[in-house]
Amino acid sequence: MRGLCICLVFLLVCGLVSATAAAPAESEVAHLRVRRGFGCPLNQGACHNHCRSIRRRGGYCSGIIKQTCTCYRN
């Protein structure tokens, strides 16, 4: 029983460490989300061009099924 508890605690600590390491750094977080459309999900170039038109560096389709146009910071 004691060994089982130690294994469970070890697994929980490993999960916590991996979840913390998987969090994106502040510089990797998307800075501007635009409502759905602007080419997503089928035309990522249209999203990129939209973001360029609003004076952002570029953009990409993000989300579960890539329906949200997300723009890069300047």
From Swiss-Prot:
Any one Gene Ontology cellular component term annotated for this protein: extracellular region
Subcellular location: Secreted
Pfam families for the chain: Defensin_2
InterPro entries listed in its UniProt record: Defensin_invertebrate/fungal (IPR001542), Scorpion_toxin-like_sf (IPR036574)
Stretch forming the signal peptide: 1-22
S-S bonds: C40-C61, C47-C69, C51-C71
Record protein name field: Defensin
Naturally occurring in which organism (per UniProt): Dermacentor variabilis
Gene: VSNA1
